[in-house]
Amino acid sequence: MIIQNYWNSVWRNLMKRKGFSFINIFGLAVGMASALLIFTYVAFEFSFDKMHSKSERIYRVQSTFHEGEVLTDDWATSSFGYGSAMQENLAGIEDYTRVGCIIQPEQLVKYGELCLRENGIAYADPGFFRLFDFELLKGDRASCLSMPCQVVITERIARKYFRDEDPVGKILIFNSNMGKVSCEVTGVMKEMPSNSHIHYNFLLSYATLPKWVQEYWYKHEAYTYVLLDSPERKEEIERAFPQLAEKYKTEEALKNKTWGVRLEPLEKIHLNPQLGYEAELKGNHSAIIALIFGAIAILIIAWINYINLTVARSMERAKEVGVRRVVGAFPKQLVGQFLFEAFVMNLIAFIIALGLIELLLPSFNQLVGRTITFSVWFTEYWGGGVLLLFIVGIYISGYYPARALLRKKPIVLLKGKFQNSRSGENTRKILVIVQYTASMILLCSTLIVFAQLSYMRRQSLGVKTDQILVIKFPGPTEGMKTKMESMRRAIKKLPLASKVTCSGAVPSEEVAMFLSNHRAHDALKQNRLYEMLSCDPDYIDAYGLEVVVGRGFSEEYGDDVNKLVINETAARMLGYVDNDDAIGEEIAVETLGEPMQVIGVVKDYHQQALNKGYTGVMLFHKDKIEWIPQRYISVVMKPGDPSELVSQIGEIWNNYFADSSFDYFFLDQFYDRQYRQDEAFGVLMGGFTGLAIFISCLGLWVLVMFSCAVRTKEMGIRKVLGASRWNLFYQLGKGFFIPIIIAILIALPVAWGSMNAWLAHYPFRTELKVWFFLLPVVLMLLISFLTVAGQTIKVVYSKPARSLKYE
């Protein structure tokens, strides 16, 4: 009966002021949708790698190198020999697995007549399926990777190569720069979940690798995972490892460094900082935290909006509450009525919010590059968190308006004088201050995020990226070197091709090949790691690298195969104070018997995006270290139709490598993909900032409307007494602009401090300028002015006689 009475009251109030109810519910729904969408994304990001039953005890072994107390290198990868040596010599390691990626990123995979270029290929030992719970649809978890020349493939790959046939027992041929190997399919696994940092299409048995590689300590090209008997063992193992490493440092390379490890918890890998040689781009922890605060701010703004509008409207309901109290209604019953009304309003808003999320989720997934569903709500505590937020929202938005009315005596409520309460007015002003403080912080932050993105895009990269077509090398074939040179010359003759060069890496990616080098005549042999870029003599000119001292490679010099060109960072790492000092110096390069001579220094350029710092790079002739493979042909295009050039190169390709797929990309687009994460963050911040301002202004608009309604007669009297229109406008507006100005004064230092800390993560960043804060202030005041003016003008320009008849 009580619930029925509550429902009747709620329905009557909803229908009585439909416009008001729509604004209230819509503002709440938009705020909920925004916050829940962000919370869904956050839940997904925090769910990474938690699907494994032993995830809390699994750690990734990451390599660290120190010179004294200085950390010089920090990698996600580790040596091939770390896993077995750690289990044999260090206490607390129950099990381990290694995932080796020594071979080139792409290989040719053949089954019958079908031959395709594939990536996502790795070498895993039997421990892989002991540590990780990836679902194996076919095959035995204990033995599918136990012998040489075995391979486990994903369900998608099985359909791709074998259609409806049973793939188990079939033979796949893998062709890489280390030769051909035939592997028997011993298992089929389900696609690795999107919320896993591990994604492979082919897992070859670790025993397939050459024997010398399997326990080699001087190749840090494996991802090693250990299962600890207790998380408390982590620090103990990290402390003991440097002493263990001394037993295995038998070669000259990196002998002067302290070899260490950092055990990174599996569940934290995705949101911890991006390290060198990560398999995938990780999440951005600072951006996630910023989005959490943004979502909470939007939710608070929506709740405050609801409270302010409900309290503002309570002047109409004061007599209703007064009558109920006079006829015997208990305070608890009245609070229950308001809470029930808040429950209904929040429930309607929640349902609308779910509908909005369902509509927006596909576009949102495309923006953030994820595959997110509502299923994340049902993992661990996230579903409970959403429910708790819903309950808190009901309490906040229902309890305060009820208490605001119950504090007044029934006689005051029956007289309808509730609106004159100074304490209630002050409370609403405080809530407006909170709303606009949050909106102002979001607005300043969004502007600075876009300013940083613009800064990174406007800066000179020091390397050419536009008008360059990049073609991936084919899989290893007979007479590869001769064919590639013939094809390069053929492409160079095309009318739309300006320059053609071959290299082991292109701008936008890690060079990914590094060697431990030092000055040849350095008695201390201070080895440091340098990225080694294999290229032909045309590379420096084609990519527009600036030679600041010396010269680049040239076919005119017959001995350039034994020369090096280094960048400025490499020169400093070698200890040269002046770039000129490096010219003619000899460098001892790891794996080479004879030193190489420096013939030139190029200006530092951005091999990767500006969210990463400069690294020491050594460019060497492609014929010098042949085990470091060539991977790309870069074609600098002349003005014209790119598709025509692609078509012409495709024809040339088929003349030489008909069995390999012709894969290409445009370098500027490939380079820009590095900024997608930052751009997505900027778009999200911008979108939610706009919503926060919209909701705040929506609430302000209704508050002004009610204020004008209450003060209509007062304004009429002021007009009769000679007040000007500007004076009337001032009287009506000052009560709203003072809280907004206070909010701005609070928000500015908070925004400056938080965004200064955010920018500190970028090695190349914009400076905080005054207009980053002045422009949001002007925008906020202008939007607020228009919101207030829209309502107050009606009262200011109304006739006094009409105003005096009001009420």
Describe the predicted segments one by one.
Residues 1-12, 16-20, 52, 242-295, ...:
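Membrane-helix entry/capping segments
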Residues 5-23, 27, 302-345, 407-418, ...:
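Intracellular coupling helices
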Residues 16-44, 282-319, 347, 427-452, ...:
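Hydrophobic alpha-helical transmembrane segments of multi-pass inner-membrane transport and secretion
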Residues 30-59, 360-369, 438-466, 483, ...:
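Alpha-helical transmembrane segments
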Residues 33, 37-40, 262, 266, ...:
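Small-residue-rich transmembrane alpha-helices
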Residues 38-105, 219-225, 238-240, 260-271, ...:
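Membrane-proximal extracellular/periplasmic loop immediately following the first transmembrane helix
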Residues 125-137, 149-283, 486-677:
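Mid-to-C-terminal secondary-structure elements
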Residues 658-745, 755, 760, 797:
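C-terminal transmembrane helical bundles of large multi-pass transporters
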